[in-house]
Amino acid sequence: MTTTHPSGFAPAASPLAPTMIHTPDGAISAGITSIPSQGDDMPAYYARPKASDGALPVVIVVQEIFGVHEHIRDICRRLALEGYLAIAPELYFREGDPNDFADIPTLLSGLVAKVPDSQVLADLDHVASWASRNGGDAHRLMITGFCWGGRITWLYAAHNPQLKAAVAWYGKLVGDTSLNSPKHPVDIATDLNAPVLGLYSGQDTSIPQESVETMRQALRAANAKAEIVVYPDAGHAFNADYRPGYHEASAKDGWQRMLEWFAQYGGKKG
């Protein structure tokens, strides 16, 4: 389970930038819940509008490598203000706590690499089920994810046939396989169940443009309903307003595109 760091952010995310955004929660209900999943109780953060008429459209928010820290919680609050029930499950909770790692390389090797994709996808199924029992509309299920969660977002779009729409922010597209990660997004382009919007950056040294073009070609070959937008002046994690690489113009445009994607493909109110 993710513990609370004094700043509200994982230590490996330091240094923090002064551009970080905090969304007030006066118009929303937000907090921590526990979701039964595969014999365990998975912690999750949720946010929803206080005033709602019937079941809410659902957005599962998938964490960055840093876990469900303050930025991901704020993403949930922003989505709640847009009328969604947003849930961010702590998908590392069985393997460890990201707050125990002081830097990104040890966080990746000591925790993130130990989390099996199959476990994550099954956990997300339980999140969707929890949402449908707690004020969410099972027929309007969406997902978005950032960095590590961006890759998972692509995979989940190929995993869950009930998903209506997905938006993946700067998630890895190609790479070496392992027992825990047997496939990458490029491998499942033919299997997408829902329209996927990918938001990427031209200056991302961890996701080169060659891999983005490889994914585009795979999507075209599969005739998949998907779109990839590249922001030429932005780097990796351009939406992470708490980090020095935050690129405000790209982040704002990406956020608006995400909302429009959800509105277009997210399903009709029952």
UniProtKB/Swiss-Prot annotation:
Catalyses which reaction(s): 2-(5-oxo-2,5-dihydrofuran-2-ylidene)acetate + H2O = 4-oxohex-2-enedioate + H(+)
Molecular function GO labels: carboxymethylenebutenolidase activity
SUPFAM superfamilies registered for this protein in UniProt: alpha/beta-Hydrolases (SSF53474)
Matches recorded under Pfam families: DLH
UniProt keyword list: Hydrolase
EC code(s) of this entry: 3.1.1.45
InterPro entries in UniProt: AB_hydrolase_fold, Dienelactn_hydro, Dienelactone_hydrolase-like
Catalytic center residues: 147, 204, 236
Protein family per UniProt: Belongs to the dienelactone hydrolase family.
Designated name of the protein: Putative carboxymethylenebutenolidase
Biological source species: Salmonella typhi
